[in-house]
Amino acid sequence: MRPLQGVRTLSWTRVVPRAHRQTRYIQIRAAPSGVPSVNGDNLPLASTPSSVESRDARFDVVGAPYSLLSVSLSASQNLYTRRGTLVGLSGKADNVVSTLSVLEPFRRAIVGVPFLYQKISSPSPVTALVSVRSPNTSFAVVNVNGSVDWMVAQRRALLAWTGRSLNIKPTINANLSLSHWGSSEVTGRGLIALVGNGQLYSVELKDGEQYIAHPSNVVAYTMASNPPRPYRFKSTTLNFQVPGLKTLPRLLQNAKFVRDVSDSKAYKTTMQWFHKLRTWSRMTIWGDRLFLQFDGPMTILVQSRGPRLNDVLSAQEANEIANVPSGFTSPPPRSTEGEKTEKNPLEDKPEEEKTEAEKAVSNISGLTRSVAELEQEIQGTSRSVAKLRKDGKVEIEEVARSN
């Protein structure tokens, strides 16, 4: 049908009311909180307990986030808190005795651990409030029951503690071990309060599980038979090496000119600067690859905001972790309790000072007896009798000998 000329064609559109329009909503929900294995895709991260108690004291963490520590003490119980952290105290103020305690200043000053603490005691029960000046910190309380010892990895993490048999000893890295520089070993029975940057969380490792953590985020961990070991992730960055005589051929190492140069003061000063530059680069440029590996069973307290790596690891520890091959960790040390092995004294004795018998014994593999034992076996066992003569002298007479 042809449209009529001069007549305008009308077009219409159907408008749907708002109530009948189709709308899609996006719902965002929190993931279900399960407790999967730590070696799986998820990590069982739990919050630290807000209160712990013993027979003589109770620690309660209050605030959101945790910013205050409430300490309830029984009569004649001592509380040690870091100097300048006491906020308030309730109870009979006339009975409270507060003294400034200097705890092992020489040992703690060497490792950078605070040694000025305030000792609070009272013959009547009191309640004290403890806090820190930093606004981005939170508290965690731990009940040390004597069955498991703790290692506080951060220098300023230990805030307060109470307990008559609680022993806190600063540790020093003397043999390039993985123990943190400036850590404190906590043994005995009592309550301790730890402070960290940001939020504090607890990681529970079961037997056979492993966890890799950055040393600046580790606040404390339980001391097990397997101490934490160095771990370094693989990377394609260029390794910084310090040139030395060992990289030269053996013929050049024995040359007189090379020996004279290596003994000069200028060469030694240059090598010292090279080593400092390598240590600085490992702690700043490649510092994000330095980690610690923990083996279960173990409990680890981690903080969400870690300090600088320089505040946690010493230069020797950074070099030790950096020297570990990428992605490789040494096997955990085995327990040697009950296994006593005697070291052969001939191993440390110079060859020119050994006798003919000692040289013969040292050349025999698998021989466990010493030279004195072999000579005694050859000579046999003799029995002698001491007789007192009339003139007052002692005469020793051999009675029998058995080979």
Swiss-Prot record:
Residues 1-30 form a transit peptide. Residues 336-359 have a biased composition (Basic and acidic residues). Pfam families: AIM24. It is found in: Mitochondrion. GO terms for biological process: inner mitochondrial membrane organization. Its main location: mitochondrion. It comes from the Eukaryota. Residues 320-364 are annotated as: Disordered. One of its GO terms (cellular component) is mitochondrial inner membrane. Keywords: Mitochondrion, Transit peptide. InterPro entries: AIM24 (IPR002838), AIM24_sf (IPR036983), Trp_RNA-bd_attenuator-like_dom (IPR016031). Belongs to the AIM24 family. This is Altered inheritance of mitochondria protein 24, mitochondrial.
